[in-house]
Amino acid sequence: METLSARFNALQETLMDLYESGREDLQSQIDHWQTLRQEQILLHYARKNGVMRLGYQPVPPLATSEQKAKDAIGMVLLLQSLQRSAYGQEPWTLAQTSLEAVRSPPAYAFKKGPQNIEVVYDGDPDNVMSYTIWNFIYYQTVNDTWEKVQGHVDYFGAYYFEGTVKTYYINFDKDAARYGRTGVWEVHVNKDIVFAPVTSSSPPTGDGGETSKHTLSRSGSPTTSRLPATTVPTGGSRTSSRRYQRKASSPTTRKKRQRQGEGEGEGEGEETNYRRQRSRSKGRTETERGGERRRRGRSSSADSTTPTDRRRGRGGGRGPTTRSQSRSRSRSHSRSRSRGGTASRVGVSPDEVGTRVRSVGAGHHGRLARLLAEAKDPPLMLLRGDANVLKCYRFRERKKKRGLVKYYSTTWSWVGEDSCDRVGRARMILAFDTYEHRQQFIRTMKLPPTVDWSLGNVDDL
């Protein structure tokens, strides 16, 4: 016990010397992470032998010390690789070589020169998100070499170039679907404002300017067919054709809007597609009309045979009915009941899904009846993150989202089968009355960056 405390105090003194020296060389940062690794190994050994406190320092659980030791080992290997590169002699501080800085986007890369930018969603000055971009990014290649590149920002996000590949590490379109409603945003970089790319809505006439319009699809990509190559990211998911986002017009008009030579073949293809769509819709209309004529023919034939059957009976009564006639009458009777709405409905309507808040009892004798009852299970949302972050988020949301969330759980964690040590991050469950409430909550929620979420449901709350 005394030996462990003495070694632990020695490691603490070494860390204090490193913090007070303020050296900015890479070797000092490697020594810092080596000392942290030894400290976590010592704490792990103490907890494994039943020691709960070293001096005034409580010993953390085994899973915590093990994970921190692995993080320290990974940082040492990463810094040693950077030290062997051409950038090993540059000044490096504790903040630049911290685990949080390395794991921030772009992950597992070193960054210098932070800069804060703001993105305004939906043109609302109150709906503003702040992002941190970097002027210089050091990334590791597959050959264990390091490259230093400059960071950039445009309307779609923050990016850097890996050779000739444009790599985005912040995407504004993902946050626009979470925080916004219209899918339009503005990027404020220092005193400059980056708007949506200008898209042409009509060809230029004469020497006058062309009419332009800011349009944006729900995915965050500009809906344009003519954009400069420098303003469109290289990712295929960020480009979309203009004709899929606007109302269909006549093929002749489309062909006139295309440039001569280049757009002519494209206009012919659109004209062919337009004719195919008209033929398919016309065929469906003919089929529906034919079905109506067949149904009318069956009903008229049934009406015509009724007087004949009555004349065959005695005393004006109904004559003998054949098996085919009884089947047709039962089918027509069921159709009339379904059309009139008097037949009993079997199943669970969309409005009833998620309305049950109690477990299904034993009174359901049959698999179908039980499945229909279980279809009303209440929907849930599971949040994963730091315990304090989840508690603060719950405190804020209980004031803002009144009427959407039925219950908030306390923070909890999983434990292993063989021990009571906590596994992974903390959890918190949100329960809703209906799936519509949960979907509305998802559209308006603003989760912290370190919190993940998933969906599910249970049979009882």
Swiss-Prot record:
Q: Which UniProt keywords apply?
A: Activator, DNA replication, DNA-binding, Early protein, Host nucleus, Phosphoprotein, Repressor, Transcription, Transcription regulation
A single Gene Ontology CC annotation of this entry is: host cell nucleus
Query: What's one Pfam family the UniProt record gives for this protein?
Result: PPV_E2_C
Q: Does the keyword Transport apply?
A: no
Q: How is it modified after translation?
A: Phosphorylated.
User: So where does this one cross the membrane?
Assistant: none
Any GO BP: DNA-templated transcription
**Low complexity: bias regions:** 339-349
Quote the function comment for this protein. Plays a role in the initiation of viral DNA replication. A dimer of E2 interacts with a dimer of E1 in order to improve specificity of E1 DNA binding activity. Once the complex recognizes and binds DNA at specific sites, the E2 dimer is removed from DNA. E2 also regulates viral transcription through binding to the E2RE response element (5'-ACCNNNNNNGGT-3') present in multiple copies in the regulatory regions of the viral genome. Activates or represses transcription depending on E2RE's position with regards to proximal promoter elements including the TATA-box.
Provide the family line. Belongs to the papillomaviridae E2 protein family.
Its recorded name reads Regulatory protein E2
Organism (species): Human papillomavirus 9
